[in-house]
């Protein structure tokens, strides 16, 4: 299995401005893909929404998973009822939906090509009462996924691999796992109330 730590800097992440704030691309696959071309398999990003109301970009070829890292948001899909999203609660929707939002937030996004892959966004919120978590309980079918990333929003977060190796992630850092994950067993620990996210992608 191949592990790589991605630091939050200009080399590894790219940030672009939009009318309501800024979006930081954490990872896009296949490597070398461009979001603007709309031909990528999956994309992981975090956006800062600095306006009270905004309209989501239509992405009809993609399924989307979104979660608030800071702040709360209300979403409306296709003129339906408004849905309230608290911090660290994942929400799935069709990228082709006509989607409106209310709320200034920092969010976390996973976009997945329809018919090609599926995914999950799993929150990890540590506290004085919860200082350890195990991957097999968080993502039961983790060992069959094709790609997995751990994003640390607030750290530090310690990640212990099945071979005993330990990696510490600080705020804004990611740990990417790819390759054969059939033996993957990870333990997460934080004594500082870390907040992190597991993003996993499977073939369909």
Show which residues each predicted segment covers.
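Jelly-roll (double-stranded beta-helix
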Residues: 1-204
């Amino acid at each position: 299995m191949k592990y790589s730590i991605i630091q939050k800097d200009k080399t590894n992440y790219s940030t672009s401005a939009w009318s309501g704030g800024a979006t930081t691309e954490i990872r896009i696959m296949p490597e070398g893909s461009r979001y603007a071309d709309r031909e990528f398999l999956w994309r992981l990003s975090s956006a800062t929404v600095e306006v009270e109301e905004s309209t989501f970009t239509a992405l009809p070829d993609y399924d989307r998973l979104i979660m608030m890292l800071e702040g709360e948001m209300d979403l409306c899909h296709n003129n339906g009822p408004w849905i309230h999203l608290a911090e660290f609660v994942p929400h799935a929707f069709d990228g082709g939906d006509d989607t409106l939002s209310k709320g200034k937030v920092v969010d976390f996004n996973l976009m997945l090509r329809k018919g090609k892959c599926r995914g999950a966004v799993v929150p990890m919120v540590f506290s004085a009462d919860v200082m350890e978590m195990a991957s097999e309980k968080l993502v039961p079918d983790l060992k069959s996924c094709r790609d997995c990333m751990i994003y640390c929003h607030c750290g530090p977060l310690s990640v212990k691999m099945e071979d005993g190796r330990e990696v510490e992630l600080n705020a804004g850092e990611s740990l990417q796992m790819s390759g054969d994950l059939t033996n993957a067993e990870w333990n997460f620990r934080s004594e500082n109330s870390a907040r992190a996210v597991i993003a996993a992608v499977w073939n369909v």
